[in-house]
Amino acid sequence: MFKKVILFSAVAFIAAENITAQSTFSAKKFLKHDTYLASDKLEGRLAGTKGNNEAAAYIKKYFKKFGLKEFNNGYYQPFKIFMKPDINKIKSDSVSTQNVVGYLEGSDENLKKEFIIIGAHYDHWGWGGKGSGSKKKDTIAIHNGADDNASGVSALLSILEEFHHNKIAPKRSIIFISFSGEEEGLLGSKYFVSHLPVDKNAVKVMINMDMVGRLNDKKELYMGGAGTFPNGVELMKKLGEGSGLNPVVFAGDVGGSDHVTFYKNDISVIGLHTGGHPQYHTPEDDTALINSEGGILVSKYIYNALVSIANYEQPLTFIKQN
């Protein structure tokens, strides 16, 4: 027990040390990303639409700017999904979309062959309506999805920029991915897991951010799956000290977003969110309600978790939870 406490104190210290006085984390930048992705211009980012493709191009631009390496000569992983033709007046039941993916190579000669994945889906429900997942199916209006999940992508890009700024790669390699097709049934993550660009056994942990932009007054950040890798619950609680957050950590309770796809394939996961709200899957999920200061606290916490896990001293083995 004494050894374990020392281990987590050291890990937390090292991770916190990486966020320097010159940190790039900024609520203003977080809000800038969210404002663009949740703008009416992108019309709700429904998979297979122009707005969805424009969101992908925006994410790709920052993946390239912040130095991520490509898999297979490109940042896009294209795939097709089947949609009900009546959703958003889509003319065909088969539409093309893409995951956006790149990686940061690890610094340890051996451990860089292992991968930690951090991701957030970027699609939403377009104009809503019949056949969609909108809670107001009789209302035809743009569902901007500022929290679901422009906020997760804003955190993803904020974390990536911090890695680029620090220019210090952790021991293991890190895959950054933004999924499409999540709303239709985790389709982007399912495609990715069945078409991995690396060996499945090399993928050790997947961290997923879905709806992290509405931090409440109690500063509660909820997470499930922390018990799916060794000492994960202890780590995630320890990282909460001095973070300005109150992590609500579950060993199991894996949830229902893209990380579930990885868990079902025996890959350790953590799924993070700031809680539900009445605007979920409605046209009212807008940027005006985003807590950008809270979003940056969450981004810093997840950055520290990612650094800690990518530098984990002990083997990262999958632990099944009930």
Regions flagged by a language model, labelled:
Residues S23, D40-K50, D86-K91, D138-N149, ...:
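Second-shell loop/turn segments in exported
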Residues L37, F63, K84, I90-S132:
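Acidic/His- and Gly-rich active-site-bordering loop/insert found
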Residues F179-H277, T317:
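Metal-dependent peptidase/peptidase-like ectodomains
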Residues H165, P278-N322:
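His/Asp/Glu-rich mid-to-C-terminal helical/loop segments that flank catalytic regions of hydrolases
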Residues M1-F25:
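Bacterial Sec-dependent N-terminal signal peptides
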Residues R45-E105:
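A non-catalytic alpha/beta surface segment that caps or lines the substrate-entry region
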Residues E17-E70, K113, I319-N322:
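N-terminal hydrophobic or amphipathic helices/low-complexity stretches enriched
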